[in-house]
A protein has these predicted regions:
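All-alpha amphipathic helical-bundle segments outside canonical DNA-binding/catalytic cores
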Residues: 140-150
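Active-site cores enriched in adjacent His and Asp/Glu residues with nearby glycine-rich loops
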Residues: 42, 67-69, 141
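A structural signal for short hydrophobic/aromatic patches embedded in well-ordered alpha helices
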Residues: 48, 128, 145-146
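Active-site acidic catalytic loop and adjacent metal/ATP-binding pocket
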Residues: 53-100
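A cross-family kinase active-site recognition segment
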Residues: 1-43, 63-65, 173
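Regulatory N- and C-terminal appendages and interdomain linkers associated
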Residues: 176-180
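Active-site activation/catalytic loop segments of kinase-like enzymes and analogous catalytic loops
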Residues: 99-136, 153-168
């Protein structure tokens, strides 16, 4: 949380703007581009459309924003002795809500695998938020929006993985992440 907050404070001073290509506004076109009929996830389409509609209805307006990394997933960060030691892959960096970044982190880093299920780890969320707030305070408006921001972040990653799964040729030399 601390390094993310520091990154947000530093980038807030930059006079740069780049639209977040994976913002909530981009999820509907992404959803429409998934070939549901041709893969084993065809029953998800209705569920995903309804969820996106609901997320859009409750998506917050005018939260504090600036440049975010936009992809703080486990394969883009390094830890040394349980401390964040490095961040890479700024391909998806762009302007969006700072709390959307925290929602991405919650989705990526605050679950534990128990058997075959991922279980939310509230202590990890608490540590992430406390670390962030030790550097940059989170407003009550931001805190009240975190649930819908987390839903949006989760949907974003599910949709990108479904897109890759349904649209990438089998001969492509890339590793496709399992949408499950």
């Amino acid at each position: 949380g601390k390094i993310t907050a520091r990154m947000h404070l530093v980038t807030k001073k930059l006079k740069l703007y780049r639209k977040n290509s994976m913002s909530i506004k981009n999820l509907n076109p992404l959803l429409k581009s998934i070939k549901f009929k041709s893969n084993k996830f065809s029953k998800l389409e209705f569920f995903l459309k309804n969820n996106l509609k609901d997320i859009n209805r409750y998506w917050p307006k005018n939260l504090p924003n600036g440049i975010i990394h936009g992809d703080l997933f486990i394969d883009n960060i390094f830890f040394k002795k349980n401390k964040l030691s490095g961040i890479l892959d700024f391909y998806f960096a762009g302007n969006d809500y700072f709390m959307y970044e925290i929602a991405i982190c919650i989705n990526a880093l605050c679950f534990d695998l128990k058997g075959k299920k991922f279980i939310i780890n509230k202590q990890k969320i608490k540590s992430l938020i406390e670390g962030y707030e030790s550097v940059k305070k989170i407003s009550s408006r931001e805190k009240s929006a975190i649930n819908v921001l987390c839903r949006g972040a989760a949907l974003r990653y599910l949709l990108t993985r479904l897109y890759d799964y349904s649209n990438t040729p089998k001969t492509a030399l890339i590793k496709i992440k399992n949408p499950n």
